[in-house]
Amino acid sequence: MEKISLESPKTGSDLVLETLRDLGIDTIFGYPGGAVLPFYDAIYNFKGIRHILGRHEQGCLHEAEGYAKSTGKLGVAVVTSGPGATNAITGIADAMSDSVPLLVFTGQVARAGIGKDAFQEADIVGITMPITKYNYQVRETADIPRIITEAVHIATTGRPGPVVIDLPKDVSALETDFIYSPEVNLPSYQPTLEPNDMQIKKILKQLSKAKKPVLLAGGGISYAEAAAELNEFAERYQIPVVTSLLGQGTIATSHPLFLGMGGMHGSFAANIAMTEADFMISIGCRFDDRLTGNPKTFAKNAKVAHIDIDPAEIGKIISADIPVVGDAKKALQMLLAEPTVHNNTEKWIEKVTKDKNRVRSYDKKERVVQPQAVIERIGELTNGDAIVVTDVGQHQMWTAQYYPYQNERQLVTSGGLGTMGFGIPAAIGAKIANPDKEVILFVGDGGFQMTNQELAILNIYKVPIKVVMLNNHSLGMVRQWQESFYEGRTSESVFDTLPDFQLMAQAYGIKNYKFDNLETLAQDLEVITEDVPMLIEVDISRKEQVLPMVPAGKSNHEMLGVKFHA
């Protein structure tokens, strides 16, 4: 490696900050501690990077995730050694599951203390090995720029993901008068971006034969910023579109070709279309169990083309008749560049549209406050254009089902790991990244209590997110499963007492409202247009369930709770 002399000696922490700034990083989420004191001393007067002080390391990681998920930019977090690093594990695992580009600096004890059970030592490299795309432990100060440059490249290319850099305290404090050349030289890491041309032609050949094709759009469409190409392809060949949870927004919910989200809480039309399709083109989707139901019967009548940037995902769960490794945007561009093939889906479109229209969503005649109506009303008030963040649980599924999405990267949620507590910090990160966009958080009373300490950030950093709590006095999704599959034994899933969330909001200096009047609800919710941080608590019935529902292990057509128009 080439050595580059510096004009004056610099500490490792100086090199961290300067390298990040040179790579275009302008925001860091973090929490100080002993092992990262050299870093925090260096950032004290550093210009060009702002630091957002979280209130818990898990919160810092989810804030970085919200920042990254809503923009596609790299999210960066800094935590101290030992408990600081282990507190960050959930956020790292969440990012790995959902392919979120993160760079996480973990403090570490000085090199001489590593492996000797020093105070606040944890083997974070070993712990994070299965939940990172790659990880490093820096052993020499001069190597910091090279390692950071490589780490950013790895995190943001191919299938995005988290990279951890473990930084011993002495390495970050020591000065060096030279650095190793910060060039990316990774011959063993060469992600495939350009799909195979012959495989692209095979897709179109099969499409010309298909009578019942379906497009399955996953989160990879958003990550590749390929929504425009997806829509053009669907419209050219008149193919109905089903999305995964993370694929929401890649096609507008109002689009006539959109059938809804598929899977466990997917729409009737989407699940029936996947079951009856004779050709499925899956793009940027990993076929997780919440989408496929019983994999043995998933799309059982269909030839499957699977386009994914990660070759490890192809054939892992669902066998692909036409495997295509490559970037989703490039694949769609290549499909669109080929001569148009003849196909006729008129009868198929007529059938799936009929399926879509024959189902009624929920009983709007019920004389109670319904969560679906709350979400629909907020969709109206925000013109379907807000960045929508959710925590995890029933409210997450209702939000996926009933908010009128229009754009990619519009839904920020924890998909693969299903992390309760994700919502509040992720919404903060999304708003910091998108100060000119409306950011709405839907959260349950359970998830709210997991990371509510992050609300302290709202006034300090002027982050006007709108927190909409759907309060059913329970862990709603757990309770629903207990009622459905455990003979109604709601073991430890019902909150007999809850904190006064209104007083909690006041303690953090946040405007607060509580609504439970059905007659005035539509008007009451208009407060959401105010440009201030706020908590809107809406009491809903404990009996509400997320429907339809495919029981675990069942096939997607075996839905419970589907209601048809008379």
Descriptions of predicted regions:
Residues 57, 116-117, 190-202, 262-266, ...:
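A general structural motif
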Residues 2-7, 142, 301-394, 518-526, ...:
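Phosphate/pyrophosphate-binding active-site segments
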Residues 119-120, 314-317, 323-325, 329-333, ...:
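Thiamine diphosphate
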Residues 224, 271, 326-329, 368, ...:
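Conserved structured core elements
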Residues 57, 166, 308, 391, ...:
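Acidic active-site catalytic centers that drive phospho-/nucleotidyl reactions
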Residues 31-33, 52-62, 77-84, 139-140, ...:
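Active-site nucleophile and cofactor-binding loops and adjacent substrate-binding regions
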Residues 2-341, 377, 381-384, 457, ...:
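N-terminal alpha/beta PP-like core and its mobile active-site loop of ThDP/TPP-dependent enzymes
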Residues 13-17, 21-26, 34, 39-43, ...:
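Active-site diphosphate/adenylate-binding microenvironment
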